[in-house]
A protein has these predicted regions:
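Detector for C-terminal structural segments
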Residues: 31-62, 109-119, 142-254
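Short alpha-helix C-terminal cap/hinge motif
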Residues: 117-129
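Short helix-initiation/N-cap motifs at beta->coil->alpha
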Residues: 131-142
Length: 254
């Protein structure tokens, strides 16, 4: 399985009073069986996301993958999901909420992904899901940009091989922060990351930044897009990257 570097996730609109409740967001994340989605539905080499920074993207000064050094922030627990939703509804003073799930029908595999999410979320008592099918362009440049959504089924691909290509999306002023997430602690930490000269200190700060984002669940990571391929066992030296040119054949030998 080869990572394509893309993270597929759910963007909650935190200007929605129901989604501003952390327990509601926790319920949504816990209701998703990521392993089942990847292995039994997508079946394309994708793997369950463990955090907001995908695996294979960036290596630490000590030579370790960011994902291996950071914590795992995702899990599937239907009972805990229901308990979190029950607590959230209690805090909101409601017995039931309805959320719109927006996705692009012209984005593969968004339709399959969205349907899976609909079933997972709707299985929770007290939560109804309304599907909003549209185009990728309308989803991003109209609905997300104007805040006309509750939950958006979306993805992000790395612009460069550093965790900040994902972590900057948590900054309150970031143009891709469509959910209007604001955390002054994260903003200050990301400012340190941008100006830090010591590589090891910067690495630790980025791990801490992801923890803040995942504790707040400003984004709900679901899976890392992959491609299932076959490679001759005798072929050595093929370099595969999730960013930029995917294959380098310069060092291939047999």
């Amino acid at each position: 399985n080869i990572s394509e570097g893309f993270l597929f996730y759910v963007q909650p609109n935190l200007e929605n009073a129901d989604l501003a409740n952390l327990n509601v967001r926790k319920a949504l994340s816990l209701a998703i069986n990521r392993k089942d989605l990847c292995e039994n539905v997508l079946k394309d080499g994708s793997q369950a996301a463990k955090g907001f920074v995908p695996s294979g993207l960036s290596i630490s000064p000590e030579g370790k993958d960011f994902r291996d050094e950071a914590a795992t922030y995702t899990s599937y627990d239907k009972k805990a999901a229901q308990a979190a939703l029950d607590e959230g509804l209690k805090e909101l003073g409601k017995s039931e909420i309805t959320l719109r799930l927006t996705y692009g029908t012209d984005e593969s595999p968004m339709d399959v992904f969205a349907t899976y999410l609909q079933n997972a979320f709707s299985s929770l008592k007290g939560l109804k899901i309304e599907m909003v099918a549209t185009t990728k362009q309308d989803r991003i440049y109209n609905k997300q940009k104007n805040g006309d959504f509750d939950l958006s089924v979306t993805r992000w691909g790395p612009d460069y091989g550093d965790p900040t290509t994902y972590l900057t999306m948590g900054i309150s002023t970031n143009g891709n922060n469509y959910g209007k997430y604001t955390n002054s602690e994260l903003d200050a930490l990301m400012d340190k990351v941008a100006n830090e000269s010591d590589a090891n200190t910067r690495w630790k700060e980025m791990i801490d930044a992801e923890k803040i984002m995942m504790d707040d669940l400003c984004y709900i990571p679901v899976f890392e897009k992959g491609t299932a391929t076959l490679q001759n066992k005798d072929v050595k030296g093929l370099v595969i990257r999730p960013v930029g040119v995917p294959y380098t054949f310069q060092y291939v030998s047999k």
